[in-house]
Amino acid sequence: SAASDVYKRQMARCAKRGQMTVVIGGRNKEEVFWKDLFPKTLKQLIVTTDDGSYGIKGFSVSVLPELFAEEQVDEACICGPGIMMKTAAQMAADAGIYCEVSMERRMGCGTGTCLACVCDKADGGHYKVCFDGPVFNAQEVCL
């Protein structure tokens, strides 16, 4: 899609300038194999595993308080399990950092007609993730 192309280009530009820190996590070393897909020009790549078999032992959100306190973070872009996104988005909000979340929903039709992918708006109503998203300002959706 055009949106994903724009995102990829922006990520490549930021990473090339050494301005992007990426935090990834998984249950174990086998689940973070995709760490090698990120550009080597990142400012920082932080890897966490629940069992400590690779990187820092713990959940990915466990490194955010220190990262937010010690680094100049302009924006957080989060995807993953709902509870992790909710926790990370709240940490970003508490630190005064703009945050976007990528909502994962089953999408039946891709046009918003079937309503299989709806998520609640923070101020009431619903978003159709397939039509309105899938990326949203974290303050505008209920996580």
What label would you give each PLM region?
Residues 23-143:
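Reductase modules of NAD(P)H-dependent flavoproteins
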Residues 1, 20-22:
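Short, charge-rich amphipathic segments
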Residues 13-20, 43:
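Conserved S-adenosyl-L-methionine
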